[in-house]
Every structure is written in structure tokens, then in C-alpha cells.
Amino acid sequence: MLTRLISGILLLIILAFAMSNGGIVLYALTLFISLVGFSELVKATNVRKEEKKPSGIEIVGYLGIVAYYIVRYLTDSDTYALLAIILTIMGMMLVYVLTFPKYHAQQVMSAGFSFLYCPVLLSYIYMTRNLTQGIFLVWLIFSASWGCDTCAYAVGKLLGKHKLAPVLSPKKSIEGAVGGVAGAALIGFLYAWGLQKAGVTAISDDAIWAFPLISGVGAVLSQLGDLAASGIKRDHNIKDYGRLIPGHGGIMDRFDSVIVTAPVSYTHLRAHETLSDL
């Protein structure tokens, strides 16, 4: 428990530093997390199989991640980002065809899924930080995901009676899930209220309800991401995706809920480039 607490605090410090600085610092951290997360997923889904070194399909994935992030760093164009995604998937298919029958079709699909699921979706953390007032907005992603995790755990411990997913995740309860969403929404409201009272940004009285809405919706999706990641682990009989974060497991173990929350939060916030428009 102590190890988990210490590593959790260190992780928050690193994230706070990266989020506050933004730019190349957050870019580098997000790229690193994406590369490690992709590696964990392809190992978990047997893309690498018995090979001790990365497979050809996996190497294409790494190159694709770097290319995709370079595009995201240099331009806001979704067209070029989509092109990087398409070329990466096509590259994986090319390796599959040229080396047939070295790889199975399932491995190619798993690699493509791993590329889209972790690196691409996580990039929306960096993109959210780049929005107007992004230094404040980006934390909504974590209030929705990790805030939900914490509240769901606390409520589940106190009131949990009805299983949410008995086979997939026996410890999760419906009461905990509801408490997680409500707690995340409350955190979002308090965060908006705190910003307003501190006078750090121009947020209207009406706009203050946008934060809890984003956090609440994000919390629902974060639990879906958590359960989906658990399903992948159970399908492949593994306990943790990795050991990078002591007491927590790997990147995918800690960021499974963030992955699906980030793009949804960004999509809403992108339509409102200033907080006063929310």
C-alpha cells in the first residue's frame, strides 16, 4: 500500500509539472506514455508471441506513433493526422502480406487496435492542453477518470451491494459506479467554482455547469474503458499490463480510464475555444 501511495504521488507530481508547462514537456511525456502503453498492449494481445524482440508489425506501430505525434506537434490539421493513422495501419498490413504466413490476421488486428486505442486516444491529453485556457481545461480529463475511480472505490466500499460486472470485475458495484459518476461531477463543479472565485479565468455562472457535465459524462466512459482493459487482461490471463509504476502495474493499468475520457472531453471543449463560451 505504501509503495502504491508513493508511486501515485510521484506520478501526480510528474503530471502536474508536465501539464503546467505544456509544450514540449507534455508532448514528450505523452509520447513516452503512448509508446509504453502500445508495447504493453501488443505483448498482452500476443502480437509479439514468443519472439524476444519486437515483431515487424510492432516496429511499424512504433514508427507510426512517432510519425503521428510529429504531425500533432507541427500542425493542428486532422487531415495529416488521419493520413498518419491510415499509413500506419496499411504498413502493418504490408508486413503481414510480405511475410505471410509468419503472422496471423488476429495479430495484425490486435496491433492496429493497440495503435488506435492507446497512442491515438491518449494524444488528446496534449491536444486539450493546447486549447485556449488548456492549462485549466486539461485537468477535467483527470477529474472525470481518476476522480471517478477514487469516488467509485470509496462509495463501493461503503455501500456496494449489487455487482456491476460479476464475471469481468467482481469487486465493482453498481452503487460504486453511480457514486463515481456523481463524485466526478461534483469535483468538476467544485473545480469550476474554485476557478471562478479565484478569478483566474472568465467563466460565467451558466458555464459553471459545463464542467460537471463534462466530468460526469467522462466518468461514465472512464468506467467503460476500465472494464474494457480488464476484459483484455482476463482474455489473455494476465494480472497487470506491466510493472513500470510500482503498486499500480503498467501504463495501461493506470491510464485505462483516461484513454477514453480524453478524446470525449476534447471534442466538447474544442467546440468552445474559450471558457466563457462553454
Regions found by a protein language model. Name each.
Residues 146-157, 222-234:
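Short helical (or helix-break) motifs at transmembrane helix termini and adjacent helical loops
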Residues 216-224, 251-259:
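Hydrophobic transmembrane alpha-helical segments of multi-pass transport and channel proteins
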Residues 267-274:
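Conserved small/polar residues in nucleotide/adenosyl-binding loops
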Residues 236-256:
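Interfacial loop-to-transmembrane junctions
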